[in-house]
């Protein structure tokens, strides 16, 4: 993964009265310190590199000297303020050249010799070197980081000439090292001498190291302004496979009020990571959120607008501090993730044993080897503490991506007649990852207890596809016409199959079935239908049971949150 997302190096170049200068690069070329050691070891041009691809990636730009990099990366003034991207062989340079607009007129009013005191730097460029085949989303993210650093440096330069001071220090150290190299036997890299003495150089090194490890960059330029950045490719990944940022954004846009926010760390540690000037609303969301509380309830408890809770939840998810789940209730069905480690002595097993001393992780995961609802773990004779511990264990496993939640989807499946053997494209059922479950099994018709999500009947006036309008009661002509209009979108054999069901003789059942018909394409799970239509779970399950001859029930992950349920490695 690091081959495609980690930068090769970070480079700072400037252009001014002294020409184009490479102020700093990291990792710097340590091989320059002892060039003789490289020539004393004959090596075949066909020999295999013993250090592997990682060393090649580290030195991907090593063939470019400092002078060459300063020439090609210090752009013209006309290119400042926009994205800079240059590809040379297998290296791609990405930056955001920035022009330093100094008020020379103001300097001349207060200084009798403005020519001597005028700033010598005209522009600078913070450049990240990447592999040429890097994903475009990675390129855009690193350009965004370069732009943020450049904006802060430009601000500090205007405020206190911070960049000019650091550049003068770097150039003085480079001259000093160059003089030492002339007196000694060979050249030395000046950057290892610059690093301990220059705060800006240490910040750039920290940014590079963070990008190569966690993907989260937090800098305090000039110990004053903060630069925060998240490389989503490093934070969101599943089973050694990258999750594209576009998939994360699509899932975040599909968040609904019936979803819940699950923090991936405890409240205390998460609050300690927040910046001092963070939003008070974010703190309230973190303190109020719960795995058994949906976002609408969270907004009410935190006294915030639902839209603001959506934005804060998306912010936490993007930064890898939380994931979106469905609120925990006894009707939830979970199965062990195919990527979960079942080793007896794995690090996760040791953590689980410390957290829950009376249980071991492999035994608990074995209970979820097949899809199982949480209601099956409940016992009327068990103490309340046992149910609390069960919730804590499920939350712990969800945080580590060890469990996958399965939802119930319904597909209309009416057998075609001989006269019409071909189905329309819209009638093809959604392919389920888990096989269909018969409605006659207890698991499919679990009505739940009064404390279950059967009582979750929230209204959602903002839903576009909501059709829970008030209908006239009784078997009136208006009801018949509305039912016929709803069934008109079906093919002839589908209408005939539905009307042949005994439950279709009941006008109320037929009208409810027709009203929910657009949900029976395998794209809306049971909980979404409950929320959109303000309907109880028991009502829907009874309807599915009555029309089971033309319906197929399947269980699989919710595509909206499936991207968050994969195992982190």
From Swiss-Prot:
Gene disruption phenotype: Lethality towards the end of gestation caused by a range of cardiac defects, including outflow tract abnormalities and ventricular-septal defects.
One Gene Ontology CC term in the entry: GATOR1 complex
Stretches with biased composition (Polar residues): 34-52, 441-468
Chief subcellular location: membrane
Key words of the record: GTPase activation, Lysosome, Membrane, Phosphoprotein
GO molecular function: GTPase activator activity
UniProt GO BP: aorta morphogenesis; cardiac muscle tissue development; cellular response to amino acid starvation; negative regulation of TORC1 signaling; roof of mouth development; ventricular septum development
In-chain residues carrying the UniProt-annotated modification Phosphoserine: 476
Top-rank taxon, per record: Eukaryota
Keyword Membrane: yes
Pfam families per record: HTH_NPRL3 (PF24064), NPR3 (PF03666)
Subcellular location: Lysosome membrane
UniProt keyword annotation of DNA damage present: no
Disordered: annotated span: 27-60, 441-476
InterPro entries: Galactose-bd-like_sf, HTH_NPRL3, Npr3
Annotated family: Belongs to the NPR3 family.
Subunit (UniProt): Within the GATOR complex, component of the GATOR1 subcomplex, made of DEPDC5, NPRL2 and NPRL3. GATOR1 mediates the strong interaction of the GATOR complex with small GTPases Rag (RagA/RRAGA, RagB/RRAGB, RagC/RRAGC and/or RagD/RRAGD) heterodimers. GATOR1 interacts with GPR155/LYCHOS; interaction takes place in presence of cholesterol and prevents interaction between GATOR1 and KICSTOR.
UniProt function note: As a component of the GATOR1 complex functions as an inhibitor of the amino acid-sensing branch of the mTORC1 pathway. In response to amino acid depletion, the GATOR1 complex has GTPase activating protein (GAP) activity and strongly increases GTP hydrolysis by RagA/RRAGA (or RagB/RRAGB) within heterodimeric Rag complexes, thereby turning them into their inactive GDP-bound form, releasing mTORC1 from lysosomal surface and inhibiting mTORC1 signaling.
Protein name: GATOR1 complex protein NPRL3
Name of encoding gene: Nprl3
């Amino acid at each position: 993964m690091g081959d495609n997302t980690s930068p090769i190096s970070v480079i700072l170049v400037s252009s001014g009265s002294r020409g184009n200068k490479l102020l700093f690069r990291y990792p710097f070329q340590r091989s320059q310190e002892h060039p003789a050691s490289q020539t004393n070891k004959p090596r075949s041009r066909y020999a295999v590199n013993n250090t592997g691809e990682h060393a090649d990636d580290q030195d991907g730009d090593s063939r470019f000297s400092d002078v060459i990099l300063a020439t090609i990366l210090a752009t013209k003034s006309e290119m400042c303020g926009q994205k800079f991207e240059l590809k040379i062989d297998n290296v791609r340079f990405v930056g955001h050249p920035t022009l330093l607009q100094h008020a020379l007129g103001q300097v001349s009013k207060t200084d009798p010799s403005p020519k001597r005191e005028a700033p010598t730097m005209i522009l600078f460029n913070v450049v990240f070197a990447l592999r040429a085949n890097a994903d475009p989303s990675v390129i855009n993210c690193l350009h965004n980081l370069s732009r943020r650093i450049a904006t802060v440096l430009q601000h500090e330069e205007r405020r206190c000439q911070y960049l000019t001071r650091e550049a003068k220090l770097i150039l003085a150290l480079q001259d000093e090292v160059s003089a030492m190299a002339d007196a000694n036997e060979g050249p030395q890299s000046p950057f290892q001498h610059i690093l301990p003495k220059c705060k800006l150089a240490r910040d750039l090194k920290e940014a590079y190291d963070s990008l190569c490890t966690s993907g989260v960059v937090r800098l305090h330029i000039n110990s004053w302004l903060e630069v925060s950045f998240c490389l989503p490719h490093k934070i969101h990944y599943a089973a050694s496979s990258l999750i594209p940022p576009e998939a994360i954004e699509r899932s975040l846009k599909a968040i609904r009020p019936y979803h819940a926010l699950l923090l991936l760390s405890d409240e205390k540690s998460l609050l300690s990571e927040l910046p001092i000037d963070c939003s008070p609303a974010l703190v309230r969301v973190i303190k109020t959120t719960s795995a058994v509380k949906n976002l609408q309830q969270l907004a009410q408890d935190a006294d915030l607008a639902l839209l603001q809770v959506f934005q804060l939840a998306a912010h936490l998810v993007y930064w890898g501090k939380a994931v979106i789940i469905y609120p925990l209730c006894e009707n939830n069905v979970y199965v062990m993730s195919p990527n979960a480690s079942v080793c007896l002595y794995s690090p996760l097993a040791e953590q689980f044993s410390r957290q829950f001393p009376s249980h071991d992780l492999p035994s608990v995961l074995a209970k979820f080897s097949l899809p199982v609802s949480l209601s099956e773990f409940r016992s009327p004779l068990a103490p309340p503490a046992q149910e609390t511990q069960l919730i804590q264990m499920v939350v712990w496993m969800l945080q580590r991506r060890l469990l996958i939640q399965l939802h119930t989807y319904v597909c209309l499946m009416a057998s075609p007649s001989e006269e019409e053997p071909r189905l329309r494209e819209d009638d093809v059922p959604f392919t389920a990852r888990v096989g269909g479950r018969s409605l006659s099994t207890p698991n499919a018709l679990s009505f739940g207890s009064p404390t279950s999500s059967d009582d979750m009947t929230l209204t959602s006036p903002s839903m576009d596809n909501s059709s829970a309008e008030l209908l006239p009661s009784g078997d009136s002509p208006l009801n018949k016409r509305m039912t016929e209009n709803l069934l008109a979108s079906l093919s002839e054999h589908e209408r005939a199959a539905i009307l042949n069901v005994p439950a279709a003789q009941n006008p109320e059942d037929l009208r409810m079935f027709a009203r929910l018909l657009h949900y029976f394409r395998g794209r809306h799970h049971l909980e979404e239908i409950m929320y959109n239509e303000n309907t109880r779970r028991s009502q829907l399950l009874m309807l599915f049971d009555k029309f089971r001859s033309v319906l197929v029930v399947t269980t699989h992950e919710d595509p909206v949150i499936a991207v968050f349920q994969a195992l982190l490695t």
